């Protein structure tokens, strides 16, 4: 299976931190501090990149137009411009050619918290906008992108229940 896991930073991420590694893993911002097996780290905000410690065993990615010696660039057409680290991570999974993308830790419409909230300067705020939801809905319509969550979220496509993901994942 040409699949990957994409880790968003919602509270449900904590439920997946001890999963054994089976697929390529893409995470956002400080993910390495809580899950060392991640392969790719994505950061949307250019000013935050200097706060993320780097390892020689990981690949670091940023949005279009912000690459550096240690940060590679995720390329996308204007219609697919990501608006946060989570959507940027999904866009990277698409760029890398994964046919199945499992999204873990996405709690849009259920929680506005981040597992890294104490590291951010701003207070907790709504993690999604209508345009972010429409973008994810558009991507999920034509591709095998599965949001794993037991709650009803903001998307048109229903989330995959956690038990179903666990069965497919082989636990």
Spans of model-derived segments:
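Metal-ion/cofactor- or nucleotide/acyl-coenzyme-handling active-site neighborhoods
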Residues: 1-171
